[in-house]
């Protein structure tokens, strides 16, 4: 699995969302590389890991990333948040958890109302085979919908989608299955390490209410909503997201994390 390492300082693992790759975090790299050693993951089937055969399932991916990185804070965006949360719940070496537009459960249920209907991800899966490019374009449009900087963010995501080669259909389908079926809420009350939940106020995929509910389930969880932000708030509001991550990591004690 390809993991780009850049910067200097405390270690921070960044995991991208569905269909993208680690380069999507460029605005955060520009702002954080002087304070952090950043580990930018390309998930299997995406970017420079396009030919990686690791199954896109939580334990396989998390163990592969953990084997290649030192003790660190893990930060996941959207789908990437499921990997980061699983790591925080299972690995002592994870010092803290930052979730950007990511919750432990992405689909709606009777006891989890602030989420999308399962049919949303099911439809994307059905459409991939018949209209690969169009399906990805529609998903990118959802990523930026509502953001105050939607046009610029969509242009950036389109560039990031193809600059390292398109993701594989297999990886996209595996990612959709994770989004449809994963429920990690049970891990939150016993998480045992600090967590930060960063939402975009105008996010159409993951509502701020869901982020706040997740933070409330995690002991000591902190919730932050980026005003006018969409599903990728680190693009149009990179200064605010970077500052939040800096403040969060600075507040961690040396006891947070292990070997």
Swiss-Prot record:
GO terms for molecular function: pimelyl-[acyl-carrier protein] methyl ester esterase activity. It comes from Stenotrophomonas maltophilia (strain R551-3). NCBIfam families: bioH. Substrate binds at residues 18, 78-79, 139-143, 231. The gene is bioH. Pathway: Cofactor biosynthesis; biotin biosynthesis. The keyword Nucleus does not apply. Monomer. This is Pimeloyl-[acyl-carrier protein] methyl ester esterase.
């Amino acid at each position: 699995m390809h993991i780009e390492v850049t910067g200097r300082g405390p270690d921070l693992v960044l995991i991208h969302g569905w269909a993208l790759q680690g380069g999507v975090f460029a605005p955060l790299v520009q702002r954080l590389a002087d304070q952090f050693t950043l580990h930018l993951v390309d998930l299997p089937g995406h970017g420079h890991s396009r030919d990686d055969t690791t199954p896109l399932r939580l334990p396989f991916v998390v163990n592969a990333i953990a084997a290649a990185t030192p003790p660190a804070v893990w930060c996941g965006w959207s789908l990437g948040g499921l990997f980061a949360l699983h790591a925080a719940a299972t690995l002592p070496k994870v010092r803290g958890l930052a979730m950007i537009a990511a919750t432990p459960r992405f689909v709606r249920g009777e006891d989890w109302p602030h989420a999308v209907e399962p049919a949303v991800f099911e439809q994307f899966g059905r459409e991939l085979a018949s209209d690969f490019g169009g399906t990805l374009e529609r998903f990118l449009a959802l990523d930026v919908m509502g953001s105050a900087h939607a046009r610029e963010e969509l242009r950036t995501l389109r560039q990031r989608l193809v600059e390292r080669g398109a993701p594989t259909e297999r990886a996209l389908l595996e990612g959709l299955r994770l989004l449809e079926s994963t429920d990690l809420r049970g891990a939150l009350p016993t998480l045992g390490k600090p967590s930060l939940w960063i939402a975009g106020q105008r996010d159409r995929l993951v509502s701020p209410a869901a982020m706040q509910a997740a933070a409330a389930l995690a002991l000591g969880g902190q919730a932050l909503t980026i005003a006018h932000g969409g599903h990728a708030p680190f693009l149009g509001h990179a200064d605010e997201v970077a500052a939040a991550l800096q403040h969060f990591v600075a507040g961690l004690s040396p006891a947070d994390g292990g070997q």
